[in-house]
A protein has these predicted regions:
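Conserved catalytic cysteine-centered active-site region
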Residues: 1-35, 159-173
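Acidic-glycine-rich active-site phosphate/pyrophosphate-binding loop
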Residues: 1, 37-43, 98-105, 154-169
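Condensing-enzyme catalytic core mediating Claisen C-C bond formation in acyl metabolism
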Residues: 49-123, 127, 131
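Phosphate/pyrophosphate-binding loops at sites that engage ATP/ADP/AMP, CoA/4′-phosphopantetheine
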Residues: 130-142, 161-164
């Protein structure tokens, strides 16, 4: 459509959730009445298929949602996410951006493909997730939709919830 605001939120597999957060904020601020959030990811083109620990966690996908004003107490009530910079090199695509591009290619062509150190990421999660969860649950969350593809990671989430007193939120995986 002509004259409609449109922009890209490049946040990899978390892009859809981040776009919903931005859209909800725009609606809440009165900038927009309705927002179409469209996400697509073609992970299969950037995976190393010889790395079974990583390639089995990712797939191609797409999703779309139309967001609009909600009644009081409905809609997206809260979003909590965090980034821990010490894990920046644990889940990367080294080449393909501005540092190692087509004019300054990397020495190893595999640098154009996604690489992940799953064990180190799990250790990072085990360090940061308990305080993150405590802060999240202070507000009486009923449902958690984690951004987690790993069965080990989801198991860790469930164990952390089981250790808490009182009713645990539903985990949608």
């Amino acid at each position: 459509a002509e004259g409609v605001t449109c922009f890209d939120i490049n946040a990899s597999c978390a892009g859809f959730l981040k776009a919903m957060e931005v859209a909800a904020a725009g609606i809440h601020a009165g900038l927009y009445r309705h927002v179409a959030v469209v996400a697509a990811e073609l992970s299969s083109k950037g995976l190393r298929w010889d790395d079974l620990d990583t390639c089995t966690l990712f797939g191609d996908g797409a999703a779309a949602a139309i967001l609009g004003p909600a009644r009081e107490g409905e809609g997206i009530l809260a979003i909590r996410n965090a980034t821990y910079s010490e894990g920046a090199d644990l889940s990367v695509m080294v080449a393909g951006g501005s540092r190692l591009n087509m004019r300054t290619p990397p020495d190893d062509p595999n640098d154009y493909l996604f690489a992940m150190n799953g064990r180190a990421l799990l250790r990072l999660i085990q360090t940061h997730f308990p305080p993150f969860l405590e802060e999240l649950l202070r507000d009486g969350v009923d449902v958690i939709i984690p951004h987690q593809a790993s069965a080990v990671g989801l198991g860790f989430l469930r164990k952390q919830l089981a250790r808490r007193a009182g009713p645990a939120p539903v985990v949608i995986d």
